[in-house]
Amino acid sequence: MTFWSILRQRCWGLVLVVAGVCVITFIISHLIPGDPARLLAGDRASNAIVENIRQQLGLDQPLYVQFYRYVSDLFHGDLGTSIRTGRPVLEELRIFFPATLELAFCALLLALLIGIPLGILSAVWRNRWLDHLVRLMAITGISTPAFWLGLGVIVLFYGHLQILPGGGRLDDWLDPPTHVTGFYLLDALLEGNGEVFFNALQHLILPALTLAFVHLGIVARQIRSAMLKQLSEDYIRTARASGLPGWYIVLCYALPNALIPSITVLGLALGDLLYGAVLTETVFAWPGMGAWVVTSIQALDFPAVMGFAVVVSFAYVLVNLVVDLLYLWIDPRIGRGGGE
């Protein structure tokens, strides 16, 4: 198969996944008990007022008509209007999405910076105390709920030690940097505002560590497994027989080849972090998409919930596409059916 045929297949898969997410999210959101019109009107509003709001929102129409209108608007780049705020969903996503991306990128960076070295050391010192510690850390990270871990680090670092802030993106007395990318760290650097940069960095540490902890163990285990396979190959034994230093063999021979099968896991971790940010943002009062969609669900804001699902699923599938193409570029044997 050629590169372009694989790209075409992946793009079709992307379209089908997003379409399936639209259908499933629409059905589930309309099966949730409750009436958005009643929530907007208030408990004391008359039935006539509630019915008028339902007509304005189009909720009085059959479900297939509502779905057709939603899909038609979606093809025109319109994710609808938030029932709760009255603003376009796309406009709200532009406000909240950068905060979630900044948190996810920083968490992924931490997971890679800590997880890859731990995976290497775990493979080199197989069945020793560090290897057992890394495996224990991986199991603990996977089995620990993010909200519980988040509450724990808040109690420790904010409540008892009082060395890090417990929530938000900035202290209340600081103004956000001029909006360029929506990433406070990057925008503060572009603005040359060191005070805002370091304050934003302090606020980012706890939620990023909480998100990174789960994936840190996964990354370490994946690197360990790939490294063990590479270290048992003939070319490694040949390099050792040639008298090359042990760590040179590990870092310059085994590690580059071990990273190739790990690309899929490392890339998809970013998509998982976008979903995982929902609970973490709620715990840390982080003003991103996670906290926004939780509020939208509580208000039965169907357009906002569906917009969140479409954007996050699209981002997840897009990351999957990029990972597949990157994997194909690094190892062309896959396109010819020769890769593993």
Predicted segment positions?
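N-terminal signal-anchor/first transmembrane alpha helix
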Residues: 1-60, 90, 94, 121, ...
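Alpha-helical transmembrane segments of integral membrane proteins
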Residues: 2-6, 97-130, 176-340
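An internal, D/E-rich "acidic patch" concept
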Residues: 3, 60-116
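Residue-level recognition of pore/gate-forming positions within transmembrane alpha-helices
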Residues: 14, 22, 44, 111-112, ...
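Hydrophobic alpha-helical transmembrane segments of membrane transport/permease proteins
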Residues: 17-68, 157-196
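Hydrophobic alpha-helical membrane-insertion segments
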Residues: 18-23, 141-162, 269
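Alpha-helical membrane-inserting segments
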Residues: 24, 28, 118, 122, ...
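Residue-level signal for discrete positions within transmembrane alpha-helices
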Residues: 96, 100, 136-143, 152, ...
